[in-house]
Amino acid sequence: MTRIKRGYIARRRRTKLRLFASSFRGAHSRLTRTMTQQRIRALVSAHRDRGKRKRDFRRLWITRINAVIHEMGVFYSYNRFIHNLYKKQLLLNRKILAQIALLNRSCLYTISNEIKE
């Protein structure tokens, strides 16, 4: 059997790993085995939190809309507001409604008055 020389392949792999883990603390940025484990964990967390971020923003938008609706003194809740929007076929998603609630409350007042039963 002839000897196989791998050359720089492993060194290149570890260099890429070191660049990825350079911002980690302690041994997680110095030791190759712990760097590898921490990299896997970081990528798992990133993947999980991409889905979580979508849920968090939706919760934030709903909270903002609900707060403005209650501040207006309207006698119906957030879910009744959304239900009336769908019945009147107004295509405004929660993100846009939350921006309107923050930046232009009078516009949201007129929308709520239009969709009132």
From Swiss-Prot:
- Where does it localize? Plastid, Chloroplast
Q: Which PROSITE patterns match?
A: RIBOSOMAL_L20
The cross-references to InterPro entries, in alphabetical order and at most eight, read: Ribosomal_bL20, RIBOSOMAL_L20_CS, Ribosomal_protein_bL20_C
CDD domains on file: Ribosomal_L20 (cd07026)
Q: Where is the signal peptide?
A: none
- Keywords noted in UniProt: Chloroplast, Plastid, Ribonucleoprotein, Ribosomal protein, RNA-binding, rRNA-binding
Q: Which GO terms describe its biological process?
A: ribosomal large subunit assembly; translation
Q: Does the keyword Endoplasmic reticulum apply?
A: no
Function, as annotated: Binds directly to 23S ribosomal RNA and is necessary for the in vitro assembly process of the 50S ribosomal subunit. It is not involved in the protein synthesizing functions of that subunit.
Please report which protein family the annotation says this sequence is part of: Belongs to the bacterial ribosomal protein bL20 family.
Sorted alphabetically, which NCBIfam families does this protein's record hold?
A: rplT_bact
Q: Which PANTHER family match?
A: 39S RIBOSOMAL PROTEIN L20 (PTHR10986)
Designated name of the protein: Large ribosomal subunit protein bL20c
Q: What is the lineage of its organism?
A: Eukaryota, Viridiplantae, Streptophyta, Embryophyta, Tracheophyta
